[in-house]
């Protein structure tokens, strides 16, 4: 059984860890609320963009779609995958879930005879693919807790240009979708070719496009895809802070339980030491009187 001094040292160490995890929980809670506000702030723009896209894609059909981001290739030989992960860990199983889903997607695509290029947002995803010998075709790290659109444009434009040049036939993104504080799940979406938004959920507005529908569509399509990527990055950041807050709360609770168990062990060890000392005194006294 460990000595009282050793147990006391462990109790002090665990209490220090609990203070750190508690502080991290509070910081993550604050950052999560800010990340949620960022997600909500971009939704009106994203909703109006989807509305305009639904109206435009309903008007532009047939041959007019060729050579645009709406064009579906007859055969799919090459795919680009954008993987969004945090820069830091300590957020439960969030990173592992996203990377596991990405790995499964890559395996499925290769089984169909397709090549896959990976673009990463976040250090965790980049480091994972580098360790597995799968060097990303593009990467963006240190995006921060409130990244600007410009921070993701380099990778986004590179992937979009790959589709336009014919290098890729499809473009997908995998990220952690923010459901609520306790639930974040890996989500995969097809970015290119752009799928027409559901017009049943949009308002019935008769837009007039200048200089013309096709010109406006060709101009707005890249912005639409960039917005989808930016929204996914913001969702991933909100998910990261939510998962870290929950993970640190669990760590704090576990530390408290461990302190309670160690305190019980400390009391038992101290009681055993006192009993032993009393027994030795009694034995010594008995020896002197005999």
Curated annotation (Swiss-Prot):
Source organism superkingdom: Bacteria
GO cellular component: plasma membrane; proton-transporting ATP synthase complex
GO term, biological process aspect, one: proton motive force-driven ATP synthesis
Major localization listed first in the record, in broad terms: membrane
Residues in the signal sequence: none
Subcellular location, record wording: Cell membrane
Protein topology in the membrane: Peripheral membrane protein
Keyword Ion transport annotated: yes
Binding partners and assembly: F-type ATPases have 2 components, CF(1) - the catalytic core - and CF(0) - the membrane proton channel. CF(1) has five subunits: alpha(3), beta(3), gamma(1), delta(1), epsilon(1). CF(0) has three main subunits: a, b and c.
Recorded family membership: Belongs to the ATPase gamma chain family.
Family matches, as PANTHER family: ATP SYNTHASE GAMMA CHAIN (PTHR11693), ATP SYNTHASE SUBUNIT GAMMA, MITOCHONDRIAL (PTHR11693:SF22)
Role of this protein: Produces ATP from ADP in the presence of a proton gradient across the membrane. The gamma chain is believed to be important in regulating ATPase activity and the flow of protons through the CF(0) complex.
Stated name of the protein: ATP synthase gamma chain
Organism: Chloroflexus aurantiacus (strain ATCC 29366 / DSM 635 / J-10-fl)
């Amino acid at each position: 059984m460990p000595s009282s001094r050793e147990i006391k040292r462990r109790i002090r160490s665990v209490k220090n860890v609990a203070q750190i995890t508690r502080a991290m929980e509070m910081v993550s809670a604050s950052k999560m609320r800010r990340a949620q506000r960022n997600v909500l702030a971009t939704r009106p723009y994203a909703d109006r963009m989807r509305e305009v896209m639904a109206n435009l894609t309903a008007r532009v059909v047939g041959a007019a779609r060729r050579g645009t981001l709406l064009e579906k290739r007859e055969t799919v030989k090459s795919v680009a995958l954008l993987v969004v992960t945090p820069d830091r860990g300590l957020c439960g199983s969030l990173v592992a879930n996203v990377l596991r889903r990405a790995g499964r997607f890559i395996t499925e695509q290769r089984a169909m005879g397709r090549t896959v290029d990976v673009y990463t947002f976040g250090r965790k995803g980049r480091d994972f693919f580098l360790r597995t010998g799968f060097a990303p075709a593009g990467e963006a790290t240190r995006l921060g807790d409130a990244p600007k659109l410009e921070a993701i444009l380099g990778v986004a434009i590179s992937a979009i240009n790959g589709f336009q040049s014919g290098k890729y036939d499809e473009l997908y993104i995998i990220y952690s979708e923010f459901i609520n504080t306790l639930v974040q799940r890996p989500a995969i979406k097809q970015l290119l070719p752009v799928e027409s938004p559901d017009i049943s959920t949009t308002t019935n507005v008769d837009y007039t496009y200048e200089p013309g529908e096709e010109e406006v569509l060709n101009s707005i399509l890249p912005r639409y895809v960039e917005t989808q990527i930016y929204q996914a990055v913001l969702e991933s950041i909100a998910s990261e802070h939510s998962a870290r807050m929950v993970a640190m709360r669990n760590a704090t609770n576990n530390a408290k339980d461990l302190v309670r168990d160690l305190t019980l062990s400390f009391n038992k060890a101290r009681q055993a030491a006192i009993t032993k000392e009393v027994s030795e005194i009694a034995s010594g006294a008995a020896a002197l009187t005999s």
